[in-house]
Swiss-Prot record:
UniProt modified residues of type Phosphothreonine: T180, T182, T247, T259, T324, T328, T335, T409
Organism expressing this protein natively: Psammomys obesus (Fat sand rat)
Membrane-spanning intervals of the chain: none
Protein name (Swiss-Prot/TrEMBL): SH3-containing GRB2-like protein 3-interacting protein 1
Subcellular location per the Swiss-Prot or TrEMBL entry: Membrane, Clathrin-coated pit
Length: 827
């Protein structure tokens, strides 16, 4: 058995040929004996073993019977082990190790083989202190360049080789892991509970619908166009929120630090600043802004109503905008980059490819700042709701998305190549074309948009003028796939400077320039492509971290179009009486076009008419199409559908003006429809509420009951970032029995509960209660209205949907969302 054990030991350690020799095979016993200094520290038996090295009582490893159990393996890994035989060896055995390894001065080969083991073990075991260069080389040669942990090596002579290997592999792996410090991930998400409340709430119930109308209205130059943040900040909000939640991705830690900061900063935005407010909303949607703003006078959307009427002009009211847009020198300069961004593949809208085929998105252009249409309504909304969203911020994903943080930040998409843009639709979008605009648009600034992952990434600078433009006849790299520029084979002359930013191959393939932020990495979870703001969704097809705008032209010559339904539910609950619940639901439908479409229209002055059909419109009332851009067929017999077609000359003129005013925009949002949904009282509210106050001179008891209502939604989806905010007066001195835990703002005297999400999967099927008792110094308290805020993605309350009619266009993305506007409950 001794020989067998010896053989196994040699195999396990990868002993050299010398060990394999029969002489060395017999020597292991003595080897185990020779390192008497090594064995002595471990146990007296070890000494006996060394002294009686030749005794038959010793086992093949040179240790007496029962020695295995006596060995303290933990000591091998510790400095003591180093001090022990092997650790001490550096002093005397340095040379002897080499000697013993090759041949020991002692005649017995057993000692040699044992020394070999010692040498191997020592370098690995005491690699920090006791390593000998010669020993290391020898070990590498014998072991095959495999470093063994000190403990496994020492163990091997005394234990079976199999055990040694196991220990070795595990310890080696474990030790480096332990030794490697992992950077601490800190998620910064300052939540100013008080700041975001006002922005979170929609317009007053009576003015909610009017507000939408007013928002829709714009000056013709900016008709329906409210600056929409082009940057895919939306993705960053996701990240930001997940990190703030305290779940930053563990690895790699290096990437984490960057992400958390961005998440943290936006939260502290004041409502006064549009961007700040937007950031706050993104990361702090759950956070509540000043209660006063909510309950105090709210800017009435009605104030904007005047503009609404002006804005909604009949087509008969012709304006210079109606003229077919021609590229002006300025537009040519600016547009070419955008055009380059635009798929060059599509010579004309005429050849309809599969509508969904438009997947390779790509509105891009030097215009990093997407300025969808600047809408007065948006501004009004901002003022009214105090939930202001900057164009850049609008691109940010909805609060929920932020929370998803995604859950983790998706790896930057691969550099967008025209091949990728043309050949494949956006990865994430449901249509498949939903990939973000950035990827497909070479024109987008080369600057990495990854920073955009921060709550409010700065817009990438426009293409530097120094960059040479390709001659009109010279196609750029990937030109074929560029979305909106005419195909190379197209009869129409190539756009001026067709490549713009994409001119350089590096800008196209560079991970830093386009791939990081603009690569088409839109994922299904990237619902963040649309930002929800105060009951209004903004399409953010350019996802800095998520990917390029889905609005890029596909290889099938269809123009990509994205649509978003955004609905706001306003409700007022009085006590526990369902009959006293007042509900008002408003919505809007927005179409988004890639910036490069302006060049496409310039090259194709007579594009195919864009016609679409709204499905499940029977629940809609007071439908208000954009009078300057939409025409409706009122003779339809089907009451459940409504068909609309776009006034293309007006649309082209409008998009041209927007491109001139905001050359850095990568896409343009155009409000098409405003509508109000027929409500059925409390049954139409996704979250039913009941509040009960008990006010006494010395204390106040508050109870809030809520219930998730799936019947109100076309598809049951979770309510995200649910917040309950209640002001408490009477000089609160102490909180008692607060369940679940809540945040108390002593300065503003209000309490805030935050629930990440409520759905059927929640405890008790989404039914719950919030309890709190307040000790008062100046009671009794006066009951105040409860303010609730939430958002939801993937469904609408109206159940409306949209489909294209005819050829030439394809939906790259259809977004559906709803959120709480003025959602109140009183005692």
């Amino acid at each position: 058995m001794m020989e067998g054990l010896k053989k196994r030991t040699r195999k396990a350690f990868g002993i050299r040929k010398k060990e394999k020799d029969t002489d060395s095979t017999g020597s292991p016993d003595r080897d185990g004996m020779q390192p008497s200094p090594h064995e002595l520290p471990y146990h007296s038996k070890a000494e006996c073993a060394r002294e009686g090295g030749n005794k038959a009582s010793k086992k093949s490893n040179g240790a007496p019977n029962g020695f295995y159990a006596e060995i303290d393996w933990e000591r091998y890994n510790s400095p003591e082990l180093d001090e022990e035989g092997y650790s001490i060896r550096p002093e005397e055995p340095g040379s002897t190790k080499g000697k013993h390894f090759y041949s020991s001065s002692e005649s017995e080969e057993e000692e040699e083989s044992h020394k070999k083991f010692n040498i191997k073990i020592k370098p690995l075991q005491s690699k920090d202190i006791l390593k000998n260069a010669a020993t290391v080389d020898e070990l590498k040669a014998s072991i095959g360049n495999i470093a063994l942990s000190p403990s496994p090596v020492r163990k091997s002579p005394r234990r079976s080789p199999g055990a040694i290997k196991r220990n070795l592999s595990s310890e080696e792996v474990a030790r480096p892991r332990r030794s490697t410090p992992t950077p601490e991930l800190t998620s910064k998400k300052p939540l100013d509970d008080t700041l975001a409340l006002a922005p979170l709430f929609g317009p007053p119930l009576e003015s909610a619908f009017d507000g939408h109308k007013t928002e829709v209205l714009l000056d013709q130059p900016e008709i329906w166009g409210s600056g929409q943040p082009v940057n895919p900040s939306m993705e960053s909000p996701k990240l930001a929120r997940p990190f703030p939640t305290g779940t930053p991705p563990p690895l790699p830690p290096k990437t984490v630090p960057a992400t958390p900061p961005r998440t943290g900063s936006p939260l502290t935005v004041a409502t006064g600043n549009d961007q700040a407010a937007t950031e706050a909303k993104i990361e702090k949607l759950p956070s509540i802004s000043d209660l006063d703003s909510i309950f105090g006078p709210v800017l009435s959307p009605k104030s904007v109503a005047v503009n609404t009427e002006e804005t909604w002009v009949h087509f008969s009211d012709a304006s210079p905008e109606h003229v077919t847009p021609e590229l002006t020198p300025r537009e040519k300069v600016v547009t070419p980059p955008a055009a380059s961004d635009i798929p060059a593949d599509s010579p004309t809208p005429g050849p309809p490819g599969p509508p969904g085929s438009a997947g390779p998105p790509g509105p891009p252009g030097p215009r990093n700042v997407p300025s969808p249409l600047n809408l007065e309504e948006v501004q009004k909304k901002v003022a009214e709701q105090t939930f202001i969203k900057d164009d850049y911020l609008e691109t940010l994903s909805s609060p929920k998305e932020c929370g998803l943080g995604q859950r983790a930040t998706p790896p930057p998409p691969p550099p967008p190549t025209y091949r990728t843009v043309v050949s494949s639709p956006g990865p994430g979008s449901g249509s498949g074309t939903g990939t973000a605009s950035g990827a497909s648009s070479p024109a987008r600034p080369a600057t990495p948009l990854v920073p955009c992952s921060c709550s409010t990434p700065p817009p990438p600078p426009p293409r530097p003028p120094s960059r040479p433009k390709l001659p009109p006849g010279k196609p750029g790299v990937g030109d074929v796939s560029r979305p909106f520029s005419p195909p190379i084979h197209s009869s129409s002359p190539p756009p001026i400077a067709p490549l713009a930013r994409a001119e350089s191959t590096s800008s196209i393939s560079s991970t830093n320039s386009l791939s990081a932020a603009t690569t088409p990495t839109v994922e299904n979870e990237q619902x963040s492509l649309v930002w929800f703001d105060r009951g209004k969704f903004y399409l953010t097809f350019e996802g800095s971290s998520r990917g390029p705008s889905p609005l890029t032209m596909g290889a099938q010559d269809t123009l990509p179009v994205a649509a978003a339904f955004t609905e706001t539910v306003n409700a007022y609950f009085k006590g526990a009486d369902p009959s006293k619940c007042i509900v008002k639901i408003t919505g809007e439908m927005v179409l988004s076009f890639p910036a490069g479409i302006t060049r496409h229209f310039a090259n194709n002055p007579s594009p195919a008419a864009l016609t679409f059909r709204v499905i499940n419109s029977s629940r809609l009332e007071h439908v208000l199409p954009n009078p300057q851009l939409l025409c409706c067929d009122n003779t339809q017999n089907d009451a459940n559908t409504k068909e609309f077609w776009v006034n293309m000359p007006n649309l082209m003129t409008h998009l041209k003006k927007v491109s001139e005013q905001k050359p850095q925009a990568t896409y343009y949002n155009v409000d098409m429809l405003k509508y109000q949904v027929s409500a059925q009282g409390i049954q139409s509210t996704p979250l039913n509420l009941a509040v009960n106050w008990r006010c006494e001179p010395s204390s106040t008891d508050l109870r809030i009951d809520y219930k998730y209502n799936t019947d109100a939604m076309s598809t049951a989806v979770a309510l995200n970032n649910v917040q309950f905010l209640v002001p408490i007066d009477g000089g609160v001195t102490k909180l008692q029995a607060v369940l679940p835990p809540a945040v108390w703002n002593a300065e503003q005297q209000r309490i805030l509960w935050k629930i990440p999400d409520i759905s059927q999967k929640s405890e008790n099927g989404g039914v719950g209660s919030l309890l709190a008792r307040f000790q008062l110094a100046e009671g009794p308290s006066k009951p105040s209205p409860l303010v609730v805020q939430f958002t939801s993605e993937g469904s609408t309350l109206s159940g409306c949907d949209i489909e294209l009619v005819g050829a030439g266009y394809g939906f790259s993305l259809i977004k559906k969302r709803f959120a709480a506007g003025k959602y109140l409950a009183d005692n």
